[in-house]
Design a protein with these regions (language model features):
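Extracellular/lumenal and peripheral-membrane lipid-interaction modules
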Residues: 1-191
Length: 191
């Protein structure tokens, strides 16, 4: 069985997407058990192919999403760890980060926000990076720069790579001054 889904201006857990087109293949569930009142379960992995377009305004509108905020905080922790900070997750617990503005340029994403420390003092934080696909599962953030007060959070990294995992296969990634577009595949495995 196969399912095709297409949407314009979709919102998923607070994330706004300009356009989404996905196809799910090999969908096998425990329908017989579901009809008997049991929980729905996947019987085999589902292979999802799709294209997602995210315009600058979509990302701007998604900045308050808890899903995006959590992902950005996790990314910042990875970046701090790569820059030899110890206990980056614990360090970030001392700050409340609110992302307020996003900017797309050719091959560059920039985020501007505010950083509130435990004394309730507020300062600015900036994160900017280029996005390059190294292979189907590795995304390079290069060059990457974080500027913040306190100054110990200021750093730059070159060629920082994010392994997206074996379940992800990105075939195309493009970024210009108006949108980010991604084509790829995802495998959803049963529990």
């Amino acid at each position: 069985p196969e399912v095709f889904l297409a949407a314009q201006r979709a919102i998923y857990q607070g994330l706004s997407l300009s356009a989404v087109q996905i196809t799910g293949e090999n969908i096998r569930i425990n329908l017989g058990q579901v009809l008997k009142g049991k929980a729905l379960r996947l019987l085999e992995p589902i292979f999802i192919c799709g294209q997602i377009t995210l315009e600058k305004n979509d990302l701007q509108g998604s900045l308050r999403s808890s899903l995006l905020a959590s992902g950005l905080k996790d990314l910042l922790a990875l970046l701090l760890e790569a820059n030899k900070f110890t206990n980056p997750h614990q360090m970030l617990e001392n700050y409340d980060i609110t992302w307020e503005e996003v900017e797309f340029t050719q091959d560059q994403v920039s985020l501007k926000g505010s950083l509130k420390d435990e004394r309730e003092e507020i300062s600015a934080i900036y994160l900017s990076t280029g996005l390059n696909l190294i292979d189907k599962q590795i995304l390079a953030l290069n060059p990457l720069k974080v500027e913040a007060k306190p100054e110990h959070l200021n750093f730059s990294l070159t060629d920082f790579q994010v392994d997206l995992g074996e379940e992800v296969e990105i075939n195309h990634l493009s970024l210009d001054s108006t949108q980010l577009c991604c084509h790829g595949k995802l495998t959803v495995k049963p529990d």
